[in-house]
């Protein structure tokens, strides 16, 4: 299974995660606060109404409490537009 990490699980992070989930990826998610899985599921349903994913098997989502636990995979950052926060996260990676 292909893997991808998403840092930040706000609106954009949930949308990106939902798309990759429907494309069959194993997604590693890190968010400072508890991720809103209900909103993630809503994004999945919205995408399924707009795009035919019948040729794909659903992926898997893993929620991590610590950013250091993310796998060594392609990582998409979807944090707030706060330069200091982004620098802090990039230094950890």
What residue ranges belong to the model's regions?
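NAD(P)+-binding Rossmann beta1-loop-alpha1 motif at the extreme N-terminus of oxidoreductases
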Residues: 1-50, 62
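Rossmann-like NAD(P)-binding element
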Residues: 32-35, 49-93
């Amino acid at each position: 299974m292909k893997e991808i990490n998403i840092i930040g699980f706000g609106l954009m992070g949930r949308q990106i995660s939902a798309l990759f989930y429907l494309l069959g990826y194993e997604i590693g998610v890190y968010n400072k606060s508890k991720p809103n899985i209900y909103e993630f599921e809503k994004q999945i349903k919205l995408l399924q109404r707009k795009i035919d994913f019948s040729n794909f098997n659903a992926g898997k989502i893993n929620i991590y409490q610590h950013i250091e636990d993310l796998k060594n995979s392609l990582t998409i950052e979807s944090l707030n537009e706060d330069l200091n926060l982004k620098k802090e996260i990039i230094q950890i990676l």
